[in-house]
Structure formats: structure tokens, C-alpha cells
């Protein structure tokens, strides 16, 4: 039996609540399949599109005097509840259909970051919708948002993405896992908080990369494997070129060389690779599997996906 952290990509969860719910129902079958094989899993998820949409909608309402503006940390908490609810419900239903008596809990999770992190001076995390270059330029002029081109898919708003330092609710996660609870935690990388005087915490406007927090969580609870589910089947080098090549198996030294060659897009595949390296360096006997959400079953059989080891 292995202990596994499964990190679901926010971009792989669809563009609407309805699409997300259908994708989550299918994902629940694969995740419960891991449980029936005797594995112990903890689930995390991204929230880039979802938190961006929540923030955009609330800002629109505030600009038209239809409600208050909400800080980004609160928007992150809303996205944890929204995505976590759909995951939790789908998992509960699938477990029940399989005759498995197991509780599922979504835990609103805070993650400590450093207020002095240089990421606050260099926004890099894409969130929200994809725009054309013309649309992005117009919104940038109107709202002052920063945009980047995101791996050939269009332009997206970027926000600071500081490094996770510690998971505030870690002991609660451990207790739930030890008591046979299926835990959904660290949604969207966790709500970023900074430590103030007397060890109090305060939310800060940012989005932590969910794969980096998932790697930290995996190390903290001594997992055997980190599974990163995204929108593509493999990790690729020379991505979107005539020389595009899928990596089926690789190791962290090779990946470090590819990072030096700038093979992975910043804010897209790069943080996944950095997270994989971090996880394995903290778990030398562990492995990382990166593949698409809809290919999880085939990837677990070794038929598809990128497997990373030391």
C-alpha cells in the first residue's frame, strides 16, 4: 500500500461549474479506484481559473455598486470551498456506490509565505480566463493588471506566487488521515498568509502554486508518490515545436538540465517540474507521476504519463 498525494490541476477541471462537476465525477471514479487497490490518498487541487473568475465577478459587482470588493485571500477561500464541495460530493457518492464506508472532508487550508518573498515584486502565476492579446491590452489599460502569454493558449492575468513555507493546518490533516478520512486540502496551493507579531496570521493577495504546496504536503506526511494531474498527457521538451518530445521516464538531474535550457514555461510546466524535484529530494525513494486528468487510469498502469524518479 502506498501513500499518495494527488494534485488536480485547476485548468484541467473545466471552465464552468457544470463542466467541472462532470469532470470531477469521472475523476472520483479513478481516485476511489486507488483506494480500492489499498492506497491511502490525500487530494489537493489548483484554482487558477476558478479564483480568477470569482475575483473578476466580485470586482465587477463592486464596480457597479452591487456589493463590496473582496480581498484575494477571501476569493481563494471561496474557491477552496467551491471546488472542494464538488470533489467531496462526487467522492462520497462514488464511495457509497462501491460500498465503502469512508468519510470525506474538505479542509480550508492556510499556507504561510514570506512577505519579503521576491515573487511579490514579479507576478508570475496565471489566473482566470484566457484572452487575446488585444483583450489583454485593453484590460491592462483599464485595470492595471499584468498579463503574460500562457504556453500558446492565450494571455492571462498574473499575480504574485510566493514560495510556501509551512502548512498551518498540517497537524489537522495528519490527524484526519490517521483516522481513515479522505482529505481534500491545500486547495489552490492554500490561502497565503503572513506571520505577524505574537504568531498571528494575516491573508495576503497572492496565489501559491498548488504543485509546490502539494510537494511540501507530500514531504510533511511522508508520501510515497506525488501525482500531478494537468491538461496534457506527458511532460514535453521542445513543446509546441516540430521537435516536441514526450518524456516517458526521467530523473531529477535530467530535469535540472532541461530547466537550465529553459524547456519549461514559467507559471505553467516549470513549477510542476520544480515541485517534482523538491518532492523527490525530500523523498529519495519516492516518485512523481505527471499526466492528464482523463488519463489517470492508464497512467497508473504505466501506459501513459511521465514518471520521475531520483
From Swiss-Prot:
Any Pfam family matching the protein: AA_kinase
Enzyme Commission number(s): 2.7.2.2
Family of this protein: Belongs to the carbamate kinase family.
Catalytic activity: hydrogencarbonate + NH4(+) + ATP = carbamoyl phosphate + ADP + H2O + H(+)
Keyword Transferase tagged: yes
Protein name (Swiss-Prot/TrEMBL): Carbamate kinase 1
Primary gene name: arcC1
GO MF terms, alphabetically ordered: ATP binding; carbamate kinase activity
Amino acid at each position: 500500500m502506498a501513500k499518495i498525494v494527488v494534485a488536480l490541476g485547476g485548468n484541467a477541471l473545466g471552465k464552468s461549474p457544470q463542466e467541472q462537476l462532470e469532470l470531477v465525477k469521472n475523476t472520483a471514479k479513478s481516485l476511489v479506484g486507488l483506494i480500492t487497490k489499498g492506497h491511502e490518498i490525500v487530494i489537493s487541487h489548483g484554482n487558477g481559473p476558478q479564483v480568477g473568475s470569482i475575483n473578476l465577478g466580485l470586482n465587477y459587482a463592486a464596480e457597479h455598486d452591487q456589493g463590496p470588493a473582496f480581498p484575494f485571500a477571501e476569493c481563494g477561500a471561496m474557491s477552496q470551498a467551491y471546488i472542494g464541495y464538488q470533489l467531496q460530493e462526487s467522492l462520497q457518492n462514488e464511495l457509497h456506490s462501491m460500498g465503502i464506508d469512508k468519510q470525506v472532508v474538505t479542509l480550508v487550508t492556510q499556507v504561510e509565505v514570506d512577505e519579503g518573498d521576491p515573487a511579490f515584486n514579479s507576478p508570475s502565476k496565471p489566473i482566470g480566463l484566457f484572452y487575446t492579446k488585444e483583450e489583454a491590452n485593453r484590460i491592462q489599460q483599464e485595470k492595471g493588471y499584468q498579463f503574460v502569454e500562457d504556453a500558446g493558449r492565450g494571455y492571462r492575468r498574473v499575480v504574485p506566487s510566493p514560495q510556501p513555507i509551512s502548512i498551518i493546518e498540517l497537524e489537522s490533516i495528519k490527524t484526519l488521515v490517521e483516522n481513515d478520512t479522505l482529505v481534500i486540502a491545500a486547495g489552490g496551493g492554500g490561502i497565503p498568509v503572513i506571520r505577524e507579531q505574537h504568531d498571528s496570521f494575516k491573508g495576503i493577495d497572492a496565489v501559491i502554486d498548488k504543485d509546490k504546496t502539494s510537494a511540501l504536503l507530500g514531504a510533511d506526511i511522508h508520501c510515497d508518490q506525488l501525482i500531478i494531474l494537468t491538461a496534457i498527457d506527458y511532460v514535453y521538451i521542445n513543446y509546441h515545436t516540430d521537435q516536441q518530445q514526450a518524456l516517458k521516464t526521467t530523473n531529477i538531474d535530467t530535469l535540472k538540465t532541461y530547466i537550465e535550457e529553459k524547456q519549461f514555461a514559467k507559471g505553467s510546466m516549470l513549477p510542476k517540474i520544480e515541485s517534482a524535484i523538491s518532492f523527490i529530494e525530500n523523498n529519495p525513494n519516492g516518485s512523481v507521476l505527471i499526466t492528464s486528468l482523463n488519463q489517470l487510469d492508464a497512467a497508473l498502469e504505466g501506459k501513459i504519463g511521465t514518471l520521475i524518479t531520483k
